[in-house]
C-alpha cells in the first residue's frame, strides 16, 4: 500500500521567512521561483534585497531600462 508523503518542510514556513531565504539568492533565481505555485508568485514582493544584472536587460537606453525596473517594484 502506498502512503502519502507529508507536506515538505519548506511549505510550512511563513511567507516572511521564505522572503528572507529568497533574498539570499541571485535575483534571477529568486524570480524564477514564482512558477512553483500560486503562493510563490507573490513572495518576490517580500524580498528585501534585489540585485539586477543590467547586462541582461536589453533596452535602447537607460531611461527605458529605468521605466521597466520601476514597473516591477
Curated annotation (Swiss-Prot):
Domain of life: Eukaryota
Pfam families, per database record: F-box
Domain F-box: 7-55
Family annotation (CDD domains): F-box_AtFBL13-like
Transmembrane regions listed in the UniProt entry: none
Record PANTHER family: RNI-LIKE SUPERFAMILY PROTEIN
Name of the featured protein: Putative F-box protein At1g47915
Amino acid at each position: 500500500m502506498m502512503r502519502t508523503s507529508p507536506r515538505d518542510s519548506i511549505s510550512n514556513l511563513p511567507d516572511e521567512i521564505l522572503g528572507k531565504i529568497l533574498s539570499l539568492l541571485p535575483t534571477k533565481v529568486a524570480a524564477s521561483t514564482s512558477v512553483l505555485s500560486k503562493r510563490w508568485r507573490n513572495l518576490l514582493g517580500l524580498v528585501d534585497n534585489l540585485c539586477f544584472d543590467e547586462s541582461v536587460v536589453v533596452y535602447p537606453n537607460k531611461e527605458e531600462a529605468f521605466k521597466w525596473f520601476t514597473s516591477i517594484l
